Amino acid sequence: FRFETTVVLPGETTLLRQYGRTLAPCIRLTPTYAEAYRRLMLEAYSAHPEAFTSSVAEREALPLSWWQQRLTTDPSAHEVIFGAISQGVLVGAVGLGQETREKARHKATLFGMFVQADHQHAGLGHLLVEAALEHAHTRPGLRQVLLTVTEGNTRAHALYTRCGFETFGVEPDAVKVGASFVSKIHMWRRLDGGVARATA
């Protein structure tokens, strides 16, 4: 499945980085990307079950309409999904979800981070986090972004640290995978004045 064009919503920032011999744009995904996003995330849940709270079976059972709704462009949507496109193919994604409860609307969570194995080590993860942080800066009242990373995933932890996140705790046995349990490191980043941008 390949995309002939890249869709960019009005007012959305498109970040470009040199990726091999092609440009890898990072865009906000729309409902037209639902099938590709579903396929990408099912691959993620299958390849790295310890990294996600949802299982591949749970997500595979959901109708396409659920994935389309997750990619809604409604201005009132509390979740946005960004995707990395390489040569017309969706190869990575990350989500940002803002709390809807009155006392917690100053917080958002980075979730669903995944880049296909063949496209790792090329800076796409950094690009996706940067896109999410730039969007977070545009959200009224949003002050901080939270995330969790599997304990022992040193590469992901290093990426988030480079992007300005700090560890504030560890949740023991946060996710059960088969007969084993894995712990989650909790990280956060405050959105201070100026553009919230990942550091080099």
Residue ranges, per PLM feature:
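Conserved N-terminal entry element of GNAT/NAT acetyltransferase domains
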Residues: V8-T32, R39, E43, I185, ...
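Acetyl-CoA-dependent GNAT
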Residues: P31-T32, R38-R39, A44-G112, Q116-D118, ...
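Conserved glycine-rich acetyl-CoA-binding loop
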Residues: K103, G112, Q116-E130, R139, ...
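Conserved catalytic-core motifs of GNAT/GCN5-like acyltransferases
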Residues: L146-V149, T161, E166-V182
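Conserved GNAT acetyl-CoA-binding A-motif
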Residues: A136-T148
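Aromatic (phenylalanine/tyrosine) cluster motif
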Residues: F1-F3, Y19
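Short hydrophobic/aromatic beta-strand or adjacent loop that forms the aromatic wall/cage
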Residues: E79, V182-H186
